[in-house]
Swiss-Prot record:
Entry keyword annotation includes Calcium: yes
Organism of provenance: Arabidopsis thaliana (Mouse-ear cress)
Protein name in UniProt: Probable calcium-binding protein CML34
Record InterPro entries: Centrin_CML-like, EF-hand-dom_pair, EF_Hand_1_Ca_BS, EF_hand_dom
UniProt-listed Gene3D superfamilies: EF-hand
Stored Pfam families: EF-hand_7 (PF13499)
Keyword Transferase found: no
GO molecular function: calcium ion binding
Positions contributing to Ca(2+) 3 binding: D111, D113, D115, Y117, E122
SMART domains referenced in this protein's UniProt entry, alphabetically: EFh (SM00054)
Keywords: Calcium, Metal-binding, Repeat
Source organism, top-level taxon: Eukaryota
Function comment: Potential calcium sensor.
Residue ranges annotated for the EF-hand domain, each copy included: 1-33, 34-69, 70-97, 98-131
């Protein structure tokens, strides 16, 4: 699933924009660990035009920013990749309720180049695909 499809899924009234309430649902789908304060702060930061709603471009930018922060946090040695063997820890840090086996299966599917690591694009596809 792409960021655009996530946008469409959570745009409940199909007006082409996400309200703060709709965005809150998205953020909590990514991770139940986001506080209301975090969500409002993210929303205000990415609402570039300040109209109180997110359009698809603002939303896509937000998704990438949120996931980049999580990725950098999980990329302990800063080499731009997360070992697939640590995927269970990574996914549970996002609040995902996977078994180690399920996590390993999802990572194997996301590790497109088969190098045993998740780069940012693979990581993003893995997390977005789970929403």
């Amino acid at each position: 699933m792409s960021a655009k499809r996530v946008f469409e899924k959570f745009d409940k009234n199909k007006d082409g924009k996400l309200s703060l309430d709709e965005f809150r649902e998205v953020a909590l789908a990514f991770s139940p660990y986001f506080t209301q304060e975090d969500i409002v702060k993210f929303f205000e930061e990415i609402d570039v035009d300040g109209n109180g709603e997110l359009n698809a471009d603002e939303f896509t930018s937000c998704i990438e920013k949120m996931l980049k922060e999580v990725f950098v946090f999980c990329d302990v040695d800063g080499d731009g990749k997360i070992p697939a063997s640590e995927s269970y820890v990574t996914m549970t840090s996002l609040g995902k309720k996977f078994t180690e086996e399920t996590s390993a299966e999802k990572v194997r599917a996301a590790d497109v180049d088969g190098d045993g690591y998740l780069n940012f694009d693979e990581f993003m596809a893995l997390v977005i695909g789970d929403i």
